[in-house]
Amino acid sequence: MNKILSLAAVTLLSATASFAAQAAETADYSGLTACGHSKNTTLIAGPNLTIYLWEFGGIVPPESTFKPLQNATVHCTGYSRIMQGKLTGMAGCHWTDAAGDTFDGESVDTPDKPGAWTFLAGTGKYQGISGGGSYSTTAMGKMNADGSLELCFSPTGKWTLPK
């Protein structure tokens, strides 16, 4: 009897794993770059501590190698702290693709590590999105007197979408 129950459990687990693998679609979004305008508001600026809030609005160029997000827009707001030359921060980003479907995520910066990105939620084809990865700033202009600047960032990693 125990062997039959064990065999049934193994069969059920195998079928469940097979269904889960078929029920999800994973995509590698490496090669994605978004460029836009950032506005920084400094709260504290000193030799040992700088704290600022920032807001970024940008777009993924149509020639992006990651086709699902060509012409997508992104809006992020965040908090950053530089203490003894080390960056710490957190931000939330809202993405809208060319069809109007959206997804949201958050980024976390910790000292001496690449920035980490996690998908939180989505609408339309992104409903149930999960996954994450890292990101880096790939181009940055000089900051203007008003705290604004242009920059590009490139996330790398994978997302999983339910089928």
For the regions a language model picked out, list residue spans one by one.
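Bacterial N-terminal signal peptides that target proteins for export
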Residues: M1-A8
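Bacterial N-terminal signal peptides
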Residues: A8-T16
